[in-house]
């Protein structure tokens, strides 16, 4: 098995760049770290380009892509966790066009979560994971929201990001228009209301807006 021993290695340089949103957007790729997340990426049919493992890590089996060993100190520089599990993958983004996304969220007849300029990676990952568990059919993000393909969000989402289509728009107005085109009833969270969430019927075909802006 090939072992990467230099930070000038082409694969290693790509992985280093993918820690930045600029290059994730440019290359249409992102990193997924950890045993469970990488395995879920494979099981859900994600397009994995390469799997990297720390030199002291057992060699994983069953991946249809190259598996490359990385000198431990170099791997630790890529890892985004204090106690790395010693495995990460480079994955090609799934970026549906508008019509494909609409078909995906219509087909499931489920709810859609809309993230409006949220920033905290842990919170966003938890929201995506919870929405997936609740049967939501997709995620829409508005410009200004943290990158869903950042390492912390990918890890916090715990595989849910692989199961839910994602689509990004430039404005809240465009997002609402998209939800309405999909036949969703739009509901926004906020403080300026007397309506409590448990009094609202949200079992299906809802576009739920979670916003950083107090509505």
Which sequence ranges carry the predicted segments?
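Short acidic-hydrophobic, aromatic-tinged amphipathic segments that line or gate anion-handling sites
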Residues: 3-5, 68-71, 165-171
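Conserved small/polar residues in nucleotide/adenosyl-binding loops
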Residues: 213-215
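RNA substrate-binding interface of SAM-dependent RNA methyltransferases
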Residues: 43, 101-193
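Glycine/small-residue-rich loop that forms an oxyanion/phosphate-binding "nest" at active or ligand-binding sites
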Residues: 67-90
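Short loop/helix-cap segments at secondary-structure boundaries that form the rim of catalytic
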Residues: 58-65
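Boundary-proximal intrinsically disordered activation/regulatory segments immediately upstream
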Residues: 1-55
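A contiguous loop/helix-start segment that scaffolds small-molecule binding in enzyme catalytic cores
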Residues: 201-210
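Alpha-helix capping/helix-boundary segments
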Residues: 36-38, 57-58, 74-75, 145-146, ...
């Amino acid at each position: 098995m090939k072992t990467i021993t230099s930070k000038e290695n082409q694969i290693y340089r790509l992985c280093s760049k993918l820690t930045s949103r600029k290059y994730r957007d440019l290359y249409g790729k992102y990193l997924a770290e950890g045993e469970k997340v990488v395995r879920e990426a494979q099981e859900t049919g994600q397009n994995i380009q390469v799997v990297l493992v720390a030199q002291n890590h057992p060699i994983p089996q069953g991946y249809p892509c190259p598996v490359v060993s990385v000198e431990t100190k170099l791997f630790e520089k890529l890892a985004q966790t204090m106690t790395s599990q010693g495995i990460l993958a480079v994955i090609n983004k799934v970026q549906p066009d508008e019509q494909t996304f609409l078909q995906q969220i219509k087909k499931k007849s489920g709810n859609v979560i809309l993230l409006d300029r949220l920033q905290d990676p842990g919170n966003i990952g938890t929201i995506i994971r919870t929405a997936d568990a609740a049967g939501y059919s997709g995620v829409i993000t508005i410009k200004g929201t943290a990158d869903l393909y950042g390492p912390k969000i990918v890890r916090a989402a715990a595989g849910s990001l692989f199961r839910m289509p994602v689509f990004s728009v430039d404005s809240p107005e465009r997002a609402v228009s998209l939800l309405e085109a999909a036949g969703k009833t739009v509901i926004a969270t906020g403080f300026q209301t007397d309506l409590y969430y448990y009094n609202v019927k949200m079992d299906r075909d809802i576009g739920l807006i979670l916003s950083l802006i107090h509505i």
